[in-house]
Amino acid sequence: MSAPLLEIDGLCVVPPGAAAPVCRDISFALARGSRTALVGPSGAGKTSLLRAINGSLPAQAGSVTVDDCRLDPRRARQLRAFRRKVAVIPQKHDLVEGLRVHQNVMAGALGRWSNWRALRFLFWPLAAELAEARQALEKVELADKLQVRAGALSGGQQQRVAIARALVQQPLLILADEPVASLDPRMAHQVLELLCRLAEEEGVALICTLHQPELAAQYFPRILEMEGGRLVDDRHGDRAKDSPSMRPLQRSEQALSA
């Protein structure tokens, strides 16, 4: 059996100024190329866990290891190498709306570019760099938006640009934080289908936080559930909706859609 891609052991996270941990003794492992949904009510600690995995929220205890590289925020070079392996798709997209789509997409390459190359790209992009941006946009069916300003795109299109940006990073793991939270049901299915298909085609592991248990069960073979900063359930997608702890989430979702 091959070694897991991601290993989390005893992770405890207390944000600055917080009185209590937002993640408590979290431990699990993920295989390379696997797809996992992270579910739970608001405030359960899902986003904080993703931020801790990426190193943007420091942990007070425990460890995070990706591809045999242990996260150590105190070592700048090691942290930079670690973050190259982990791409983040934030809930708010984090696109620069005044820049063109190809510029936002190629921001995914900043971790492997020098500062000079990044600055030069903003004003004088090379043909090869534009070709790489176009290739990533073709994967998310937005190649015709290469030169459009990001602010002119719809919410679903902006989410797909964020996915293309993550692919350009060439990561081993993608962390997607509520990628369909602001989308209507039809667009939510389209984005999840695209995200899961591309992760499988690229051989990239995927962790996706979701509020909708039925979407988690439909698109993800494994579901981790959080409550009160702890992992309370770890089960396969085909049995997830039968879990008693998932039923309050289902009732809440049904009430919102009624």
PLM feature spans:
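Helix-to-loop junction immediately C-terminal to a conserved catalytic motif
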Residues: N54
